[in-house]
Curated annotation (Swiss-Prot):
GO MF annotations, alphabetized: rRNA binding; structural constituent of ribosome
Designated name of the protein: Large ribosomal subunit protein uL4c
Predominant location: plastid
GO biological process: translation
Gene that encodes the chain: rpl4
Keyword Ribosomal protein: yes
């Protein structure tokens, strides 16, 4: 079951002062929201897995076609191949094989999980005016000063969501190991949940409303 929620934010300018207000209307899950968020997180985590682990069975290991000794009369245990899983250098029983760990999740469910996560993070979300025009060249110090004006702690993870990635902004933020920059159309559940604070530009907020509120 989904319910409509309206999130009201104060908008901060580059100097750290309140310059206006912004609203975000979201359809979020009321009952099973965290279950959907968990499924979306598992899906994204699984898609990062390479899935290339591979072992050889006794039929794939080189050699072992000849019976190592006769069946009876040697006093030793009977053996049919030196590549038996019981032998050193033999095949592996039920070992891993290359596989895909991808889990299926409907687009509507994924979007609902994202909206629910955004709603849950609303207390730790800061809306700011677009700041691309301040970066005429890459300058990390410029962004750090803005972070301090917005009263954010760089010792904790900060997620910055912009309308589209500006090369100068991206290069300025890249040096900060606790800050991640993503565009609104590549919003993902893992980045949202990992962030302690979320910064969203005004244009990115409009794009989130447009793209994910289906």
């Amino acid at each position: 079951m989904t319910v409509n929620t309206q999130l009201n934010y104060q908008v901060y300018n580059w100097e750290g002062q309140v310059s206006g207000n912004a609203d975000l209307n979201l359809k979020v899950s009321q009952d099973s929201g965290m279950y959907l968020v968990h499924r979306a997180l598992v899906k994204q985590s699984n898609e990062k897995r390479q899935g290339s682990a591979n072992t050889k069975t006794r039929s794939e290991v080189r050699g072992g076609g000849r019976k190592p000794w006769r069946q009876k009369g040697t006093g030793r245990a009977r053996a049919g191949s030196i590549r038996s899983p019981l032998w050193r250098g033999g095949g592996v029983i039920f070992g891993p094989k290359p596989r895909s760990f991808t889990k299926k999740m409907n687009k509507k469910e994924r979007q609902l999980a994202l909206r629910t996560a955004l709603n849950n993070k609303s207390v730790n979300t800061l809306i700011v005016e677009n700041f691309n025009s301040y970066f005429h060249q890459p300058k990390t110090k410029l962004f750090m000063e803005a972070i301090h004006r917005w009263n954010l702690d760089l010792n904790k993870k900060v997620l910055v969501i912009v309308d589209k990635k500006d090369p100068n902004v991206y290069l300025s933020i890249r040096n900060l190991h606790n800050v991640e920059l993503i565009s609104a159309d590549t919003l993902n559940i893992m980045a949202l949940l990992a962030a302690h604070k979320i910064i969203i530009t005004v244009d990115a907020l409009s794009k989130i409303q447009e793209v994910y509120n289906g």
